[in-house]
Amino acid sequence: MNTTSSKSKKKQDDQVGTRFLGVRRRPWGRYAAEIRDPTTKERHWLGTFDTAEEAALAYDRAARSMRGTRARTNFVYSDMPPSSSVTSIVSPDDPPPPPPPPAPPSNDPVDYMMMFNQYSSTDSPMLQPHCDQVDSYMFGGSQSSNSYCYSNDSSNELPPLPSDLSNSCYSQPQWTWTGDDYSSEYVHSPMFSRMPPVSDSFPQGFNYFGS
């Protein structure tokens, strides 16, 4: 039993020494780290540590101090070749990569006019005007065609006209032929006064535009 225990303990010590450079396990369970100076071939004692990783890190610090980027280390360092370490574990001493720089603020002014033009373009059904043709009669009896436009936006709808005004202002005059003269029967608007009677001295009737 004692022989078997000694062999397994020695095998464990060999595995620790093989895994990490410059690390040896002490009989009482702690780990010692030492390094050999490449110039003088002397061994330098680095201390005793509770874990093998701490002892391996002490070795790496001493090796990098002596040999620089040509050192053989236990852990991976970003400033050294990947093949220089005996493990793939990243060293705790290796600083994390810097965070990406923040995005530069945008200095472009907001084009409110462009936004308004896009919103008020003819593609918008809320802002498309509708035009209708309205036939109206002038007092001289000549017919003219007028157009007006309105928007279909319900929020801008005008209130209805009063009944007396709507029945009188937009009524068309009724013309009656009586022979040699013109006579008219029409409904007057409250906003306009009655037209003066036509004098017999004007043989051409209603000729407002001159001869």
UniProtKB/Swiss-Prot annotation:
Annotated GO CC locations: nucleus
Region ranges (Disordered): 1-21, 74-110
A Gene Ontology biological process term: positive regulation of seed germination
GO molecular function, one term: transcription cis-regulatory region binding
Gene from which this protein is expressed: LEP
Annotated organism of origin: Arabidopsis thaliana (Mouse-ear cress)
Expression sites by tissue: Expressed in germinating seeds. Present in young shoots, at low levels, especially in leaf primordia and developing leaf blades. Also detected in vascular tissue, mostly in xylem, of young leaves, petioles and hypocotyls.
Protein function: Cell division-promoting factor involved in leaf blade differentiation, inflorescence branching, as well as in carpel and silique shape. Promotes the number of xylem cells. Positively regulates the gibberellin signaling pathway leading to germination, hypocotyl elongation, and leaf expansion. Probably acts as a transcriptional activator. Binds to the GCC-box pathogenesis-related promoter element. May be involved in the regulation of gene expression by stress factors and by components of stress signal transduction pathways.
Subcellular location, principal: nucleus
Annotated protein name in UniProt: Ethylene-responsive transcription factor LEP
Domain of life: Eukaryota
